[in-house]
Every structure is written in structure tokens, then in C-alpha cells.
Amino acid sequence: MSNWLVDKLIPSIMRSESQKSSVPEGLWHKCPSCEAVLYRPELEKTLDVCPKCDHHMRINARTRLDIFLDEEGREELGADLEPVDRLKFRDSKKYKDRLSAAQKDTGEKDALIAMSGKLEGMPVVACAFEFSFMGGSMGAIVGERFVRAANVALEQRCPLICFSASGGARMQEALISLMQMAKTSAVLARLREEGIPFVSVLTDPVYGGVSASLAMLGDVIVGEPKALIGFAGPRVIEQTVREKLPEGFQRSEFLLEHGAIDMIVHRGELRPRLARLLSAFTHSPSPVSA
């Protein structure tokens, strides 16, 4: 019996454990909506939209810009800008430590990435919030990058598109972060005066100071399916008004029904749909592939 254990069973267990450890991490992903277990390479083909239930999963800012902009001619804007802890703010942690941790986790300097490029051959400027960086909160660098992107759109007289995913203003920057609401709104007013289109795409989630400023100031406001959009969260509102909120409250479908946004577009259709829309705005020839 002892020989059988040593010669057969133990080597078999060791081989099995070795095979388990050789499976790459992150190869499978569970849908947070329907809990289907999905093969990661196949999920990437659907742009992180569940093929079983059509749930639009959160994606990072660079991935979003990669799938939206043409491959050629991209130029990142404001990449040299880095956040500074001017107030020496501290809550349960020092702000500078939170920044360092977020930068290490995401590989980004702050919560907004801006790029000039092309959309099906049409010059555009696009921005995307990185929700994984301190909840996509808007501080001085986010505001400055957005303004620089808008200024490039003004100089080139081309459309500006912003993909919002944010919890709101960054509390660690206090009044400096609140000032970004006015700063971004002011530059969007200049775009409107010049007749340059701004398309705001609301992804899951958009709250607080971002929803109360740039996110809701688009000439066209687009929502991704079932994105949460509001100022305060539904639980906070329920506790305040002490009433049960309507079914689907703050979902993009609810906002569309009540006239707060203009359309809901599936992620896979967003690129050609916006290309057609912007060609109409700018009186450019419609893209052939659209």
C-alpha cells in the first residue's frame, strides 16, 4: 500500500496541481449581471459586452479611446501634467499616498486621458475618464486636461467627444476641485459660441460634480445601456426623501424616457453612429464604413 501511495497517487496529485498553476490568470471573467463565466479573449471581441445578457462592463480609459479612435494619427494631450497635493490634505490617508497608490494601480498620472486623432477619417478630440483612478474624480489635472482638449478642438475646429465615468469632484482638492466645474463649463461655452460640436457619452457611472457640469452640457448626450447617471446616489436620495424610488431610477433608459439624454447607443455601434452624427454636424462627407 505504501509503495502505491508513493509511486502512483502522490505524483498524480502533484501533476494535477502543476497543471492548475499553469493556467494563466485572468483567462476567465464572470459577468456581474448574469454571472456567466466568459472566456476573456472572446469577451474582448465584444468590447467587454456580455454576449449572454448584453451587460456593458466597465472598461478603462485607454481601452475606450483605442476602440473609438482610428489607429493612425493619435496624439495624447496634457500627458506631462501631474497632480500636486497643494493643500496637504489628509483623511484616513494622506492625499499624496492615495495618488501614489492610484498611479501604481492604473499606470496613469490622473483620472482623465485626452487625445487628438481621427474618427473614421474625421479629425476629432476625445477624452475618457479612468474610473479606477480614485473613482474618476475630477481635480485640477482632470480639469486642465479637459480644457486643453477643448482648446485643441477650438484651434482645429473639430468635434470634441468626452466619455464620462466619475464619482464627481475630488474632495481631497476641496475648492480647487469645485472650481473645475466652472472651468470646464466655461470652455464648453466657448465651443458652443464657435459652433463646434461637443458630444458627451455617459458610461457607468456618472455622478456628482462631473454630472453637474461637463457631462450634461453636450450638444448631444449619449448614454450606454443601463449606465447609472445622477448627482447623488439612489441610496442617499432614498434616505433623504424617505420614499421608494421608481424602478430603474437613474439608469440611462430612465433618463432617456424623461428627456435628460438624447439617445442610448450600444458600445459596438457607438463608433459608426457618432461618425455619422458628427459628419452631419460638420457638413463632412459621411464615412464610407458607417
UniProtKB/Swiss-Prot annotation:
Q: Please give the catalytic activity noted in the UniProt record.
A: N(6)-carboxybiotinyl-L-lysyl-[protein] + acetyl-CoA = N(6)-biotinyl-L-lysyl-[protein] + malonyl-CoA
Organism, scientific name: Pseudomonas paraeruginosa (strain DSM 24068 / PA7)
Q: Which HAMAP family match?
A: AcetylCoA_CT_beta (MF_01395)
> What is the protein name for this chain?
Acetyl-coenzyme A carboxylase carboxyl transferase subunit beta
Q: Where is the CoA carboxyltransferase N-terminal domain?
A: 27-290
EC code: 2.1.3.15
What function does the entry list? Component of the acetyl coenzyme A carboxylase (ACC) complex. Biotin carboxylase (BC) catalyzes the carboxylation of biotin on its carrier protein (BCCP) and then the CO(2) group is transferred by the transcarboxylase to acetyl-CoA to form malonyl-CoA.
Q: Look up the record and name the cofactor or cofactors this protein needs.
A: Zn(2+)
Q: What does the record's cofactor remark say about binding?
A: Binds 1 zinc ion per subunit.
According to UniProt, this protein's pathway is: Lipid metabolism; malonyl-CoA biosynthesis; malonyl-CoA from acetyl-CoA: step 1/1
Specify the superkingdom: Bacteria
Record Gene3D superfamilies: 2-enoyl-CoA Hydratase, Chain A, domain 1
Metal-binding found in the keyword field: yes
Q: Which Pfam families match?
A: Carboxyl_trans, Zn_ribbon_ACC
Which residue stretches are annotated zinc finger (C4-type)?
A: 31-53
One GO cellular component this record assigns the protein to is: acetate CoA-transferase complex
Q: Which family does it belong to?
A: Belongs to the AccD/PCCB family.
Where located? Answer: Cytoplasm
Protein's UniProt keywords contain Metal-binding: yes
InterPro entries associated with the record? AcCoA_carboxyl_beta (IPR034733), Acetyl_CoA_COase_Trfase_b_su (IPR000438), ClpP/crotonase-like_dom_sf (IPR029045), COA_CT_N (IPR011762), Znf-ACC (IPR041010)
